């Protein structure tokens, strides 16, 4: 009887283990239902200015038909989101942003001359479905302390 119970327990344990190993949605490439983008930001390399330029890598899934990006001061973005809402702001980025011509699995961009705190929003579109991703970049702001002509003596 004890052998029978042990074998039955082993069969139940094996069955429970096998049935618990189901594939979760979104883990297999090509099964996504909505467009998606992941934004990676890097320090810009020469000849760009690493203090005020940012390099971005955009990773798109296979459902993306078109993509747009908009870089603006973080305070301006916050005020627009407060008045328009998230969906309205995504529409704003699509209509006023820059269209990314080549939507490959990975696309690289370099944004230049960014002084202060910026929010970079990327919106991806598939039909009437939209998804956005945001990254922030803070570029150095320079302020003149003294104006005038400087003379240096060489000895």
In which residue ranges do the predicted regions lie?
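Beta-strand-rich modules
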Residues: 112-131
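Edge beta-strands of extracellular beta-sandwich domains
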Residues: 131-139
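Extended, solvent-exposed segments with strong compositional bias
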Residues: 91-101
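Bacterial Sec-dependent N-terminal signal peptides
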Residues: 2, 15-46, 140-153
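Solvent-exposed loop/turn segments flanking beta-strands in beta-repeat/beta-sandwich domains
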Residues: 54, 58-89
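Ser/Thr- and Asn-enriched, surface-exposed coil loops between beta-strands
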Residues: 45-57, 103-107
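Surface-exposed, short loops/turns at beta-strand junctions within beta-sandwich domains
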Residues: 100-103, 108-117
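Bacterial N-terminal signal peptides that target proteins for export
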Residues: 1-9
């Amino acid at each position: 009887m004890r052998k029978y119970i042990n074998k039955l327990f082993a069969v139940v344990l094996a069955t429970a283990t096998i049935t618990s190993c189901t594939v979760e949605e979104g883990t297999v490439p090509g099964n996504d239902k909505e467009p998606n983008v992941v934004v990676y930001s890097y320090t810009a390399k020469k000849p760009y200015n690493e203090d005020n330029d940012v390099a971005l890598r955009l990773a798109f899934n296979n459902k993306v038909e078109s993509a747009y990006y908009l870089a603006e001061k973080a305070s301006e973005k916050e005020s627009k989101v407060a008045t328009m809402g998230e969906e309205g702001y995504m529409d704003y980025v699509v209509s006023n942003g820059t269209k990314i011509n080549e939507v490959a699995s990975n696309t690289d961009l370099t944004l230049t001359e960014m002084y202060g705190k910026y929010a970079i929003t990327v919106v991806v579109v598939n039909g009437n479905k939209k998804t956005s991703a945001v990254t922030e970049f803070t570029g150095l702001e320079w302020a003149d302390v003294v104006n005038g002509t400087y003379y240096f003596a060489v000895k």
